[in-house]
Design a protein with these regions (language model features):
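Non-catalytic terminal/accessory segments
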Residues: 1-202
């Protein structure tokens, strides 16, 4: 029974988090291979991770426990029962995978009369994103600028403030802070460039 299997596995996440540890071990190996610039090894380890049962369990758990878990995509599907979650784990594959269209909704901007658009993927697409993020994160965090703090794992606004303070506290430090915003940044990301240059399963 797939529902019982999920319930048993889900319980193990709390009592014996072995599935998560297995994924984290492979992520550590990916980060080490990235540091050593062994890109073929990075690809092999990334393939192993994204095709492992433990990583698929973790990906489904991520998308069924976050804030958007009650918001469906264009297919109207949600994974709420144990059976649905385990079936999702067993069905996750990149074989002939094609992402479905995004569901577009508009939410109010805080303190403004205008609304901003949000694109909602299906649960399956979210799980695939979470699965591949597990492989991409150790690469990104190993190679990223150490002075970058936005949308980074284990980094927050307080870290950015602390770094700014360190840069400005000396007598000969810079005396100017420039604030800028890139208009439509995420709407204009060059996805083709990313596909060509990210060393994962090219």
């Amino acid at each position: 029974d797939v529902g019982w299997e999920w319930a048993k596995t889900n319980e193990l996440f709390f009592i014996y988090p072995g599935q998560k540890r297995m994924s984290e071990y492979t992520q550590t190996r990916i980060a080490k291979a990235t540091q050593e610039r062994k890109w073929n090894l990075v690809k092999r380890l990334s393939y192993l991770l994204t095709h492992s049962h433990s990583a698929k369990l973790l990906a489904v758990r991520i998308v069924t426990r976050n804030k958007g878990r009650r918001t469906p995509g264009v297919d109207g599907e949600l994974w709420t029962s144990a059976s649905e979650k385990m079936r999702a784990v067993l069905s996750l594959t990149d074989h002939q995978y094609r992402a479905q269209p995004l569901r577009r909704i508009y939410i109010p901007k805080p303190g403004k009369t205008t609304k901003r658009p949000i694109s909602i993927p299906t649960m399956y697409d979210r799980a695939m994103q979470a699965l591949y993020a597990l492989a991409l994160q150790p690469i990104a965090e190993t190679t990223a600028d150490t002075r970058s703090f936005g949308f980074r794992l284990y980094r927050c606004a307080q870290d950015a403030s602390r770094y700014a303070y360190t840069c400005l506290r000396g007598k000969s430090s810079n005396s100017w802070i420039l604030e800028g915003d890139i208009k439509g940044c995420f709407d204009n990301i060059a996805h083709e460039w990313l596909r060509e240059h990210v060393p994962v399963l090219r």
